[in-house]
């Protein structure tokens, strides 16, 4: 067995396929005789020295892990600040890594997680500790720079498009005597990728969603209400998909929840769908229903995209390969080779090009009226939701998901008092 262990940690909001990435990491490491330790609840588990020995899990359990949503080892929203501000925490992290002979650190998350992995690699180098840090991409927001798409996004996009298409059939059936406007709120703070993917639900101008509201275009309430009225008068009903992060012309979030922020320092947004529904009811008098799918859109493994599932495993395997090749401060990203047929490959990118960068939708993806997507956007989104990821069902009619044993590794250091 090669000397040293590999530490894997999950960060931020989980997805329908982040465990597929974990399975890719563990499977590839096992094939190369490397033990994988997992941090319980992300980077906090590493700081607390709460580590899990994945070698105690059977091959069958790891195979089932690839079909299970959520985060099997626990995740967290905890951002390490700069090396100057949080130096003691970074040093504690290195102390834990050294105590458990960790030579490879894989951090599975978004922009902030890429930044943390980069800083850990820099500190390890400064301390002369032989550590290879690899970022592993994950986010349903699809806002990571460099990569063509992000593992987790394709499945969330598929859930969104399917949900909007099905809900539209319901609204159309009831519109004559009941609900005329349905508003669906999608995740997406500064980038509207997920809401935009709902555009796949329809083909023609009268198909749902007739209106998509994105952060990339300033929200104009008068224009929005006029469009709703136009669609109801033309087809009898209207479906709206709104990104949670839509902003007005002054850059203020439409659903600003009193200025509160989450643990990453991001604005804590309230319900934009409820706000829009109130405006439609008050100004136009239509009966409105709205929904906030929230965790459902990122945990719906039963609707996972096969493309997304395969890419999630591929970045996990590539991360291990890069680490064992001696690469450092890099992240495996997805490069699109062609649209039709859709082909892709995994390539390494420097972490500093991903850390704390945010990718928004290009203007060419947005219709001139600001209420929908272009054919170019459709060509981008379409292959990402293709195929159905494998999923076993039990005799009870429900998906068979696995719960790992998560056997703890004995601690070697004093308790962390951070």
From Swiss-Prot:
GO molecular function: 6-phosphofructokinase activity; diphosphate-fructose-6-phosphate 1-phosphotransferase activity; metal ion binding
Pfam family, one: PFK
UniProt KW Lyase keyword: no
Pathway assigned to this chain's UniProt record: Carbohydrate degradation; glycolysis; D-glyceraldehyde 3-phosphate and glycerone phosphate from D-glucose: step 3/4
GO cellular component terms, A-Z: cytoplasm
Site features described as Important for catalytic activity and substrate specificity, chain residue numbers: 112
Thermal behaviour (record text): Optimum temperature is 40 degrees Celsius.
Keywords: Cytoplasm, Glycolysis, Kinase, Magnesium, Metal-binding, Transferase
Name of the protein: Pyrophosphate--fructose 6-phosphate 1-phosphotransferase
